[in-house]
Curated annotation (Swiss-Prot):
Main location: cytoplasm
Gene name tied to this protein: rrp4
MF GO annotations: poly(A) binding; RNA binding
Family designation: Belongs to the RRP4 family.
GO cellular component: cytoplasm; exosome (RNase complex)
Cell compartments where the protein resides: Cytoplasm
Pfam families from the UniProt entry: ECR1_N_2, KH_6, S1
Annotated signal sequence range: none
Protein known as: Exosome complex component Rrp4
Any one of the GO BP annotations: RNA catabolic process
Length: 260
């Protein structure tokens, strides 16, 4: 069964104590203030937006991409309407201005924490934590930031399953950028799963649906693999089973030829 989609003004609950994100209270009743998915929990009711830009908040952990290097700051694209600023003092060690492009240069991807967002939407970033670092391998997939909770799942159920079933390393930024790393075929499989999660975020039982999807895709991957090859006597050349058999028969014919 699909989850209920609501629009602004829809009645969600008559219990004022349960008002959550994406709601407003009027006459002791809770209404939706967004177009999104009704999110009912024991202690509150809220709305998960169907779409919308990422709006940074303090303590968010995001994946940023360096777009400018100045003598004292790195400026990052954080997949938001506003760029993020990492001051050199927020780097884990002392850095001279001339070193900055060598440490983080334009195009580099980094896991960062949002330190502060002021009233003018100036976004300050931080890197002073062992879990925050430059990403040197893997690739980045972008999903809508409002779909991030579905990628993670209740209690981390979805992301734990994705890691186990694809054998990939995964980090989900709150800005919708997801870093993945692993073997090529595993990355391809995980990328498909993430796209499916994004498209079907409003569906119930999504973790089970994605689990079954991954199992079926694994079967297809195995069935599509080519038949094994035998190595030929010539270095760097491979031969099929049929070629290998023909070579053996040719050698036997030579041995049995009365002229030899």
């Amino acid at each position: 069964m699909d989850k209920k989609i609501v629009i602004p003004g829809d009645l969600l609950s008559e219990n004022q104590k349960k008002a959550g994100y994406g709601t407003y209270v009027k006459n002791d009743k809770i209404y939706s203030s967004l177009c999104g998915i009704e999110n009912l929990k024991e202690d509150k009711v809220g709305v998960i937006p169907l779409a919308g830009a990422y709006i940074p908040s303090a303590n968010d952990v995001v994946i940023g991409i360096v777009i400018v290097v100045t003598p004292s700051n790195w400026i990052f694209d954080i997949a938001a309407p506003y760029d993020g600023l990492l001051h050199v003092s927020e780097y884990p060690r002392r850095v001279e201005s001339r070193e900055m492009p060598e440490i983080l240069n334009v195009g580099d991807s980094v896991i960062l924490r949002v330190k502060d967002v002021d009233s003018s939407m100036k976004v300050e970033l931080a890197l002073r934590d062992p879990s925050l670092h430059k990403l040197k391998t893997g690739q980045i997939i972008k999903v809508e930031s409002v779909k991030v909770p579905r990628v993670i799942g209740h209690g981390g159920s979805m992301i734990s399953m994705l890691k186990k079933e694809t054998n990939c390393s995964i980090f989900v930024g709150q800005n919708g950028r997801i870093w993945i790393d692993g073997k090529d075929e595993d990355i391809e499989l995980l990328s498909k799963a993430l796209r499916k999660i994004e498209l079907e975020a409003q569906r119930s039982g999504l973790t089970d649906r994605i689990y079954n999807f991954l199992k079926n895709e694994r079967i297809r991957q195995k069935e599509s693999k080519p038949v094994g090859f035998f190595k030929n006597e010539t270095e760097g050349v491979t031969a099929t089973k049929e070629d290998h058999s023909e070579e053996i028969y040719r050698k036997i014919d030579v041995l049995l030829d009365p002229k030899n």
